Swiss-Prot record:
Signal peptide: 1-20
Gene, per the UniProt record: SRL
Region span, G4 motif: 254-257
Region (G1 motif): 99-106
Keyword annotations from UniProtKB, A to Z: Glycoprotein, Membrane, Sarcoplasmic reticulum, Signal
The protein, known as: Sarcalumenin
Length: 472
């Protein structure tokens, strides 16, 4: 009898154990296949990454020799607040994640890098979880870097962030992860936008910091949750900052499998209705509808559509990675164009000031008259008569009131005086970089030849192929 009772107890225990395991298996979500992600981003390829060290060295030399002298002489950084460092020239492409709180930005990064259920994964949750600007970059081992260390390291591209103060640096964190994708790209996760919170409560200029990252991002993902489309004043401010960057913006309607088909269509229309006043361009940004996390899609949803949308987004990301060197050269060339226009404007202001000054004139009153009404003296119209100057590249007239408010006109020299016997003229050097050296360097990448900036034999001095992913 005792043996029978013991046998019954053993059988009951096994049944209970089996039931518990079944419940545990049923409660654990099934993971999605990642082969499409690895194939699209070419993470399985064993070939080494393209070595652009020679091109980067030449690009850095062109910048320091031909662009930076004019940039410093006419204090361009005080107008645009965008100082280019060596770290920025050599940096990897940056992908920026923006959007309201708890829409899945951190979860999306975890999914792209396969960090879920690993010690490396970013913390996620239903509540606002990310209060820092988190830079996820490549490193030999898992390592966390404080913001003050990142800003102090001149080899990185984040040293200019010191200007936002110590309060911000405490909210900046870097994470190094040994991942193949991070060898070619850097991800930046941002704090979620909370409409009912004043940005002043953050203790640092949140919008200015966002603008800094926006100006340097190669691809910008603006993520939304279909269950809470909260488009308010703070999000409106964000899209105002994104103006002019429409070609880099990708809008993501995340967690799409959490809604039925009809509800998803309504949300899709509501999203466009809300964003239409904020994006005033003929061709709207691309919108991706999917669920970017590692678990299987919910049953009875458009799985094939979501998968195709995800692959399209991955192809977009891969294009930015493949074109990283072309983007870098195009960005430096565009920067050089703006520096040249700024120098021409300052030179014209100075020349007009000298022409209007007499022995009995009050210099301050004369220049105030010029700055208040530059059109009266044809300042900007005269610049448009110069070669290769577009009216769409001209800075705002109001910006020069502030610029000359802190930079006296008498502290500048005319462009004709910015020449030396050995070094040549600053203006001629930057024009040569814009029209010959940088286009030649760009052409040498596609042809796989060593850059030759002494002639136009390789690509000619004509127009370079259009790159729709380049920075504006």
């Amino acid at each position: 009898m005792k043996r029978l009772n013991l046998l019954c107890c053993c059988v009951a225990s096994l049944l209970l154990l089996g039931t518990a395991e079944e419940v545990e298996d049923a409660s654990e979500p099934t993971k999605r296949d990642r082969s499409h992600l690895e194939n699209t981003l070419k993470l399985n390829e064993d070939k080494p990454a393209d070595d652009f060290s020679g091109v980067l060295q030449r690009l850095r030399k062109i910048y320091h020799a031909s662009i930076k002298p004019l940039e410093q002489s006419y204090r361009y950084n005080e107008l645009r607040q965008h100082e280019i460092t060596d770290g920025e020239i050599t940096s990897k492409p940056m992908v920026l994640f923006l959007g309201p709180w708890s829409v899945g930005k951190s979860s999306m990064i975890n999914y792209l890098l396969g960090l879920d259920d690993t010690p490396y994964q970013l913390y996620t949750g239903a509540e606002p979880t990310t209060s820092e600007f988190t830079v996820i970059m490549h490193g030999p081992k898992l390592k966390t870097i404080e913001g003050i260390v990142m800003a102090a390291d001149s080899a990185r591209s984040f040293s200019p962030l010191e200007k936002f103060g110590q309060n911000f640096l405490e909210k900046l964190i870097g994470i190094e992860v040994p991942h193949k994708l991070l060898e070619r790209v850097t991800f930046v996760d941002t704090p979620g936008i909370i409409e009912n919170r004043k940005q002043q409560e953050r203790g640092y200029p949140f919008n200015d910091v966002c603008q800094w990252f926006i100006d340097r991002a190669d691809l910008i993902f603006v993520v939304f949750d279909p269950t809470k489309l909260d488009v308010g004043l703070e999000l409106e401010m964000l899209f105002r900052q994104l103006k002019g960057r429409e070609s880099q913006i990708r809008i993501i309607l995340n967690k799409a499998d959490s809604l039925a088909t009809q509800e998803l269509m309504r949300v899709y229309g509501a999203l466009f209705w809300s964003l239409a006043p904020l994006i005033n361009v003929t061709e709207p940004p691309r919108v991706y509808v999917s669920s970017f996390w590692p678990h299987e899609y919910h049953p009875d949803t458009h799985k094939d559509l979501f998968l195709k949308e995800e692959i399209s987004l991955l192809e977009d990301l891969n294009q930015v990675i493949e074109n990283r060197m072309e983007n870098k050269i195009a960005f430096i060339r565009q920067h050089a164009i703006r520096v040249r226009i700024h120098a021409l404007l300052v030179d014209r202001y100075l020349q007009t000031y000298k022409d209007k000054m007499t022995f009995f004139s009050d210099g301050e009153l004369v220049f105030r008259d010029i700055v208040e009404d530059p059109d009266k003296f044809f300042i900007f119209k005269s610049i448009l008569a110069k070669t290769n100057v577009s009216k769409f590249d001209l800075p705002n007239r109001e910006a020069y009131k502030d610029f000359f408010g802190i930079n006296p006109i008498t502290s500048f020299k005319l462009l004709s005086q910015q020449c030396s016997y050995m070094g040549g003229c600053y203006l001629e050097k930057i024009e040569k970089a814009i029209t010959r050296e940088l286009p030649d360097l760009l052409g040498s990448i596609g042809l796989g030849k060593k850059p030759n900036v002494l002639s136009c034999d390789v690509t000619g001095c004509g127009e370079t192929p259009k790159n729709r992913y380049k920075k504006p």
